[in-house]
Curated annotation (Swiss-Prot):
The lineage of its organism: Bacteria, Bacillati, Actinomycetota, Actinomycetes, Mycobacteriales. HAMAP family: NAD_kinase. Belongs to the NAD kinase family. One of its GO terms (biological process) is NAD metabolic process. This is NAD kinase. GO terms for cellular component: cytoplasm.
Length: 315
């Protein structure tokens, strides 16, 4: 049910990491803050979340008199009609919520209750101020590019998917190496054996691609990153291409079967001899921004980078 604030109907979808008591308590705080502001709240729940939802909707929780809460289940319509998706958790929970936000073409706001939480806009200790900004609509929305992934066998499309962070092409058996040929914009670049190949967005450059040795790319820069993983070749270095490039990875016939993991959540089968084509996604993910802090400051804070000795430029 949508609540009405100053003549305007507003509703927000809450997606929280299941099973953690601290997140359950935080979710109750969110519900009560939105109740006071006259904003309706949807809570995402699936079967694995049932015990958490029961705790959140007990009398002292979300079902307090006058509190407008609707329980919804995962699906393409879960977020339709909402103003935004609010995430309580880490990056895994954020990626789960991003699927729903993209389908509904609404922005997503992450509150980090995980470990690093690079995708989150703010930390748990700033929850009240973040929610106050949402209530006052004092936020801006930016778009983050995504990836569209297609798998072909003999020019026939057998599967497709999308990713916000990265598409990870990996050896299915984990035995031996995956033999691939890398192609950019219709031209072969290198053939090599490897554990896998990552194709990442700038948003994903601080995730799996970073762990595999790829560069950190500022989110304002639109580009595609290609990062081979444990490649057995002289030239198998990370590449940064145009955002309009077509990246293709062909698995050599007679090599191992592979798998393509989209954000580590959605899995596509990759038979030996198949071809993976990855391009800039047609539908971006919308991102709630609460402040204009430089990306460098966020990176230093999240990764706890040493900056002792920095003097800076004098004005």
């Amino acid at each position: 049910m949508n609540a009405v604030t100053n003549g305007e109907s507003r509703e927000i979808l809450l997606v929280a990491h299941p099973g953690r008591r601290d997140i359950t308590e935080t979710a109750k705080r969110v519900g009560k803050i939105f109740e006071r502001a006259g904003i309706g709240l949807r809570v995402l729940v699936d079967e694995a979340d049932s015990s958490r939802i029961e705790a959140m909707t007990e009398p002292e929780g979300f079902s307090a008199p006058g509190l407008d809460v609707t329980v919804v289940h995962p699906g393409p319509d879960a977020a339709v009609g909402c103003e935004l998706v609010l995430v309580l958790g880490g990056d895994g929970t954020f990626l789960r919520a991003a699927e729903l936000a993209q389908e509904a073409s609404i922005p997503v706001l992450g509150i980090n209750l995980g470990r690093i939480g690079f995708l989150a806009e703010t930390e748990a200790e700033h929850l009240d101020e973040a929610l106050a900004q949402v209530v006052r609509k004092e936020y801006r929305v930016e778009s983050r590019m995504t990836l569209d992934v297609v798998i072909r066998v003999d020019d026939e499309i057998i599967d497709r998917g999308w990713a916000l962070n990265e598409a990870s092409i990996e050896n299915r058996s984990r035995l031996g190496v995956l033999e691939v040929v890398l192609e950019v914009d219709g031209r072969p670049v290198s053939a090599f054996g490897c554990d896998g190949v990552l194709v990442s967005t700038p948003t994903g450059s601080t995730a799996y691609a970073f762990s595999a040795g790829g560069p950190v790319v500022w989110p304002e820069l639109e580009a595609l990153l290609v990062v081979p993983s444990n490649a057995h070749a002289l030239f198998a270095r990370p590449l940064v291409t145009s955002p309009n490039s077509i990246i293709a990875v062909e698995t050599v016939a007679g090599s191992h079967d592979g798998l393509v993991f989209c954000d580590g959540r959605r899995t596509l089968e990759l038979p030996a001899g198949a071809r993976v084509e990855i391009v800039r996604g047609a539908t971006p993910v919308k991102w709630v921004r609460l402040d204009s802090a430089p990306f460098a400051d966020r990176m230093v804070r999240k990764f706890e980078l040493p900056v002792t000795g920095w003097r800076g430029r004098k004005p």
